[in-house]
Amino acid sequence: MKSKFIVIEGLEGAGKTSVIQQIITILHSNGIHNIISTRDPGGTPLAETIRDIIKKGMNGEYITDYTELLLLYAARTQLVAQVIKPALMSGTWVISDRYDLSSQAYQGGGRGIDIRLLQNLRDAALGKFYPDLTIYLDLPPSKCRARIRARGIPLDRIEMESLSFFQRTSIRYRELVANDSRIITIDAQQSIAELNATIRNNIERWLKSQQK
C-alpha cells in the first residue's frame, strides 16, 4: 500500500497524543512499520522555533491575530516541504498532531478571521496537498479546559484563551468536518476502552478501503 498522511485534530485536551500512539500500534499490527510522527506547528528546527513563539510569545510583545496566522503557515509550509512530502515519497507513513484544519478552525472560529481569506491562504501555501485521513476528536470545550488544568503545568499562550474562544473554535471545527468525507469524527467523551475500540474499528475499516 502507498504511504499515507494521517492527521489527528481536536481542541487542547482532546487526547490527540494518546490517539496518535494508538494509531501507530494499530498500523504496526497491520504490517505497517515505516512510520514517523510529527506536529504542526513544529517538526523542523525552524518550525519548532516558530512554535515556541506562537505558544510562549516573544518577550511580552503582543502578537496580532494576522501575525500568528502567518507564523503558523510559515511553520506549516516548512514542515510539509522538509518532512512530510519527503517522507511520503520515500514510502514512509506520516502521522501529524494537527495540520491545516487547525488554522481553519482556530483562526477562522476562535480568532474570527475571514474564512475566504483563510481558504485562499491555504490554497496559496499548500496547493492541493491534503491528508489522506483526518481524525477529529470531538470533546466539549469545557471538558478540554478541565483536562488541561488538571495537568498541573503552566498554561501556554493558546491554552490561556477564554472558554468562548474554544467554543467558537469547536463550532467551526464541526462545520468543517461535516463537509469533508476524508475526515472521521470521533466522540472523545467515551471511556478509554470505548475510545480505543472506536479508533481501532475506524482505522482498520479505512485501511481496508485503501486496499481496494
UniProtKB/Swiss-Prot annotation:
One of its GO terms (biological process) is dTDP biosynthetic process. GO terms for cellular component: cytosol. ATP binds at residues 10-17. It catalyses: dTMP + ATP = dTDP + ADP. GO terms for molecular function: ATP binding; dTMP kinase activity. It holds the Pfam family Thymidylate_kin. The keyword ATP-binding applies. Its EC number is 2.7.4.9. InterPro entries: P-loop_NTPase (IPR027417), Thymidylate_kin-like_dom (IPR039430), Thymidylate_kin_CS (IPR018095), Thymidylate_kinase (IPR018094). Keywords: ATP-binding, Kinase, Nucleotide biosynthesis, Nucleotide-binding, Transferase. Phosphorylation of dTMP to form dTDP in both de novo and salvage pathways of dTTP synthesis. Belongs to the thymidylate kinase family. This is Thymidylate kinase. It comes from Baumannia cicadellinicola subsp. Homalodisca coagulata. The lineage of its organism: Bacteria, Pseudomonadati, Pseudomonadota, Gammaproteobacteria, Candidatus Palibaumannia. The gene is tmk.
